[in-house]
Amino acid sequence: EKGTQTLGKAMTKEEIDYIVDAFAKASLRAKQSGFDGVEIHAAHTYLINQFLSPYYNRREDEYGGSLENRMRFLLEIYTATRKLVGEDFPILVKLTASEFFEGGVTFDETRSVCKKLEEIGVDGIVVSGNIHGKADTMIGESHDGFTIQAEGYFHEYGDIVSREIKAPVITVGGLTDIDAIEHIANNTGIEYFALSRPLLSEPKLIKRWQEGDRAPVECERCSKCRTKRGNFCVVNKDRKVQLAAM
C-alpha cells in the first residue's frame, strides 16, 4: 500500500473471528453510550469492502471466490452485532455502489448484497461509491449503466436499490443544495440523506435551511477538512477566524 508502505496479507480464520467480535462489541458500546444506532462501513476500500471486492479478495477458502463467499465476512459482522445489540437497535450498512474500475465490485453485485442484507434484517442501506476524493472530476461519467451526478453523486444507484428492497435507502456524497436534495427526495425512492463535510463547513446548516435561507452551503467538497489538527473546514471564513483564536 503506497500510503502506509505496508504489504497486505490474507487474514487467518482466528483474525477474522476477532474482527467480527470487535465490530459487534464496538456497536454494543455505542448503544450503551446512548447512540441511536450504528453504521457498519463496508465501502471505500476499507476492510469489509476488500472482502467484497474480487479485485482485492483472492482468497480460496469460504471467504473468497463467489459473491456468496465474499459477502460472508460482512454478514457475520452484521449477525454478531445484531445478537449483541438486540432487535430494537438500528444497524445501517454503507456499501459501494460500484468500485468504478475493471475487476472491482459491480453494481449488480452490490444490489445482490443489499437484498441479502434486507433478508437478514438490516435497518437501512447507505449507497456510496469508491472514488477516493475524485467525485468532482468524475461527474457525468457512467459506470454500470448509471451516471455520477453533480448533486448527490450516487443517487441514481441508490434509486435502483430503493426499488428493489423495502429497507430505507440513504444517499451520501455531494449534497450541498437543499433544492437538489428535495428534487431527489420527490423523484426517487431514496428516503434519507447523509451529510458530513457540509456540516463541518456550516454546523447550523439544517437550521438555516429550515428557517428559509435556502442558499447552498459553502463547501468546496475538497476534503481538506481532514487535518492533523482534527476535522474542520479550511474554506469557511468564519470558521478560520474561530480556529485562529483557539
What are these language model-derived features?
Residues E1-M246:
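Flavin-dependent oxidoreductase catalytic cores
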